């Protein structure tokens, strides 16, 4: 399915760093919000006719209810780089990567044994982990490495903007097909190499919102974490892996422990560190522990019995109290990272 409609811009709702949100009225008088990327298009004005991609909304996919405006006029956004994003599509454009700026940095074989590396399967994991870390270690340097398992434009993430503006994240690197970080790298390994040059202490690899899931065993985009974890291990790194737990999730395949987490743990050939919070709900804890204990021969399970859970955040539309276990598990992951740093 690919559906384009003409419409008229009726109102500007938001002008953020790198994009514009407007209200568009279509030929059938439907009115919806649309996003205009200012990297690839001029700012649109009230009364202007625009071409809009409405495919995701028509399919009722998780795009936040937005349509996307296509470029409609001559436009040039100069870049010194030669590495293409959205390759071989009508919207391909170039970026300047760190590999182009300083190739010598990336020609050595890396060692990641001095870097704490977290691999997240969901974008909503990034915010609580970073908030907790910076709450108790404000001078820590955190780099968020954003890949292409979800949406691609980092500037669209409200969580990332909040983290950067409030200094809960120091640097943002986008890699693979993702773009609009503070820095651009080709892949996760080179992103980690570059993050070391920034004196990063904790590197958190995460997708943006909008990961793909099909309900099948391997049909989810975060399965790529298997390859990323194995590559990190190949170069001496040890990954901290925050397991996705939930007591509030209605979908059986994600209840208690998400099948995404379990599939990654089952098929990755490298060992990861899995912090487990000892939940007050002993029945829930026992069920989570029994499942994860099956992976003890391969992975390192760490009990975290005490955290400071006064940091309240939201995830995927559910408040802290509505999906408390999800956050407590992420806070426990951050608590484990703090303890690792204290031992160094």
Residue ranges and their predicted role:
Residues 31-34, 113, 143, 175, ...:
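Generic preference for well-ordered secondary structure
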Residues 2-114, 128, 137-140:
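Extended, charged alpha/beta regions that create polyanion-binding interfaces
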């Amino acid at each position: 399915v690919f559906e384009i409609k003409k419409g008229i811009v009726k109102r500007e709702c938001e002008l953020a760093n790198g994009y514009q949100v407007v209200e568009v009225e279509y030929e059938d008088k439907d009115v919806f919000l649309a996003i205009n990327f200012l990297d690839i298009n001029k700012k649109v004005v009230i009364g202007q006719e625009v071409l809009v991609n409405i495919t995701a909304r028509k399919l009722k996919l998780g795009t936040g209810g937005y349509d996307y405006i296509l470029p409609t006029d001559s436009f040039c956004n100069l870049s010194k780089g030669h590495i293409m994003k959205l390759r071989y599509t009508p919207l391909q454009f170039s970026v300047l990567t760190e590999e182009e700026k300083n190739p010598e940095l990336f020609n050595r074989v890396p060692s990641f044994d001095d870097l704490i590396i977290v691999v997240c399967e969901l974008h909503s994991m990034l915010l609580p982990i970073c908030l907790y870390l910076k709450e108790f270690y404000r001078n820590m340097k955190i780099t968020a490495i954003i890949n292409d398992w979800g949406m691609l434009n980092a500037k669209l993430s409200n969580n990332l903007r909040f983290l950067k503006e409030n200094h809960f994240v120091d640097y943002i690197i986008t890699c693979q097909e993702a773009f609009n970080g503070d820095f651009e790298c080709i892949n996760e390994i080179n992103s980690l190499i570059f993050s070391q040059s920034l004196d990063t202490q904790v590197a958190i690899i995460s997708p943006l919102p909008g990961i793909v899931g099909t309900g099948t065993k391997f049909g989810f985009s975060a399965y790529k974490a298997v390859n990323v974890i194995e590559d990190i291990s190949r170069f001496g790194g040890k990954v901290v892996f925050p397991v996705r737990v939930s007591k509030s999730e209605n979908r059986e395949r994600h209840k208690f422990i998400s099948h995404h987490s379990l599939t990654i743990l089952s098929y990755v050939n490298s060992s990861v560190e899995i912090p487990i919070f000892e939940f007050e709900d002993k029945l829930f804890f026992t069920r989570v522990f029994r499942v994860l204990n099956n992976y003890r021969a391969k992975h390192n399970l760490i009990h975290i019995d005490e955290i400071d859970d006064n940091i309240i955040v939201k995830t995927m539309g559910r408040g802290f109290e509505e999906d408390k276990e999800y956050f407590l598990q992420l806070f426990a992951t951050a608590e484990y990272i703090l303890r690792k740093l204290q031992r160094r």
